[in-house]
Amino acid sequence: MARQLSSKKPKRLGYTVGRLLGYMGHYKLLFFAVALLVTVSAVANLAGTYMIRPVVNSLDGGTWQEFVSGVVLTACVYGVGVLCALGYTQCMVSVAQKALYDIRRDLFAHLQDLPLVWFDGRNRGDVMSYFTNDVDTIADALNNSFAMVIQSFIQMTGTLIMLFVLNWKLSLIVAVCYAAMFLYIRYSGRRSKAYYNKQQACLGELDGYIEEMVNGQKVVKVFNHEDASIETFVAKNRALQKAGTGAQSYAATMIPAVVSISYVNYAIVAVLGGIMALRGTMDAGSLASYLVFVRQAAAPINQFTQQSNFLLAALAGAERVFEVMDEKPETDEGGTVLVNVEAGADGALRETEHKTGRWAWRAPDGTLTPLRGDVRFESVDFGYEPGHPVLHGISLYAKPGQKIAFVGSTGAGKTTITNLINRFYDVQGGRVVYDGIDVRDIKKESLRRSLGMVLQDTHLFTGTIADNIRFGKLDATQEEIEAAAKIANADSFIRRLPKGYDTMVTSDGANLSQGQRQLLAIARAAVADPPVLILDEATSSVDTRTEALIEKGMDRLMEGRTVFVIAHRLSTVRNANAIMVLEHGEIVERGDHDDLLAQKGLYYKLYNGMFELR
């Protein structure tokens, strides 16, 4: 389900701006250079305008030399402003790109720390939208708008001060016009900000839907779902259009309103200033300088108004990004870790830095417990949502080297049990014990290093065949990779590929068959060499020959390990040490194949095709 965002309270705006400034503040020297150059550029523009006054006055009673020197000096001051503007632009680009790098890095790192339950409620397109749409809007604002808004603010403030210095009476009129402009900008900004927030949320939802439809094109076409998918897309696109129209409508009215007010302001000041000059209460130079200031005042206000629209869009994106980064990460209070061990002269285990292939659990007090693969469920209760239990009082025992199979219809709780072993989720009642240790006391990284998984939906990554197998053990040698491929019965098909183990795999393994992807998944688990395996059986979608290869690979992989199998075909679990039959989150039958058939219960009915097994 796509994530929905409502408009934030005003206090969130200050938090978001402060956090963005914090990222830029990591580069203090560059950030200081930006602030200094922006200030100098704005002051130079103000000073150049003020210097028009003596230049004009020099025409009345002054010398030609005074006039020329005044023009040259004024041009030099403006030149300094231009050079500073070029300088702060380059510095700002550097600061912005460094800050964006940090934001992307921190966002991605935080995503890796979030629990699976966070991803369960979001589609991939919406998650991707944080990195693309939201971060891109931040990039546009930091690269182009941030420094301009600061310069505009300094220039507006400085202009107002200079206007009061030149003539405070006329400046009262200007101040009233300024106030009217800012009141309108504030009103429009607040209204458009809510729409910008909604626009970013709708954009993420639309991206997610597009990704779903692109990935599922075969299903869409098989079921003639094209028209229905277009209708859904149109509805989501219309929601985005509505939010975008609302945001841009308010934003678009700001500049014309500001321009209109500035023209009225200029006309009033020009008339009144001219009257003052005719009466001798204001000299020509002051009037000329004053009118230029008034005219220039419109430029930073227009610029501020225009860039503030981009900033509002960026802040809406930044709020979404920082909301994700503020999500509570996956908790890990375990203190027991997995370490390499070797036997001492007295036969006792001791920790070593060498890769011995022998492992043990090291408790916080230093006690070493051999890694054996002994797994117990003791009266485990669990539910994905409060008040909706999925498992009820699950108790089972898998001795080292045993094969435990789970069978039952869809939704019975088979996959949920395996998710609790590796702590993708934590139990809500009872406990899961691994080698006599509560899994909640084991550091998750160590726990998952001791487990291997072969899932029904095989996920491969862009890279070579070898890289995908090495994903199970990042420091695996080429020899270990090839040995794992042989265990999985994948070596022969890999060597028939044009580049063998160096063949590139496209995203999600689209250039390989379903069976080949499953064989690589088995090889990936084999190279990790874990004592405990979780297998989500998936042989129904491949041909008979490939199915036989997969079964042989599975059998080799399971040798000498504790194995939990989610069975989809009862013919493959006959040799299991124990079969757990689940129904509505409870183990309703248990025993080996022959015992369960003799009971003539649910397993018997499933085996004889009286009920569907999935």
Can you name each region flagged by the protein language model?
Residues 2-8, 97, 105-129, 133-135, ...:
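Short intracellular "coupling" helices and adjacent cytoplasmic loop segments at the cytosolic face
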Residues 13-28, 127, 131:
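A short amphipathic helical element positioned immediately N-terminal to and/or at the very start
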Residues 25, 36, 47-48, 62, ...:
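Hydrophobic alpha-helical transmembrane segments of ABC transporter permease domains
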Residues 26, 116-117, 135-142, 146, ...:
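An intracellular "coupling" helix at the cytosolic face of ABC transporter transmembrane type-1 domains
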Residues 31-87, 164-169, 280-284:
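Transmembrane helix-loop-helix hairpins at lipid-water interfaces of multipass membrane proteins
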Residues 61-63, 162-176, 246-319, 324-328, ...:
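Helix-loop-helix
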Residues 111, 233, 321, 352, ...:
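Conserved catalytic Walker-motif region of ABC-type ATPase nucleotide-binding domains
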Residues 341-614:
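ABC-type nucleotide-binding domain
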